[in-house]
């Protein structure tokens, strides 16, 4: 059965309040790639993907799980390298970013001095142009940034 909009907003607000009550803070790094216009017919720099990048950082309170149960790993097909789950709310993301759908390929999570890359994003109960929460599965960035 479809959830009414008022019940959906109730769930969304309840989840958001839980996030605000947590002691954890994470930083999201959103990487923007500036397109390089080749000056010649073929440019090795543009081809290889060595375009200049800029990063913007946003800090949020978040729920963070350091251990992932085997059942969750099986359900979502997560590799063993995935070592954490971050939960955020669209009520945090939309005011800061203007959207809540994150590009996993251009977003990194900074938590407790570690840089983590996103392996998978699940939008929890996506209804009415929003969702209750954003579940982000992360793994350590072995490339170092």
Located regions from the model:
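Intrinsically disordered, non-coiled, low-complexity regulatory regions enriched in serine, threonine
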Residues: 12-16
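Short, conserved turn/kink motifs that form compact alpha/beta structural patches or helix kinks used as
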Residues: 1-8, 24-145
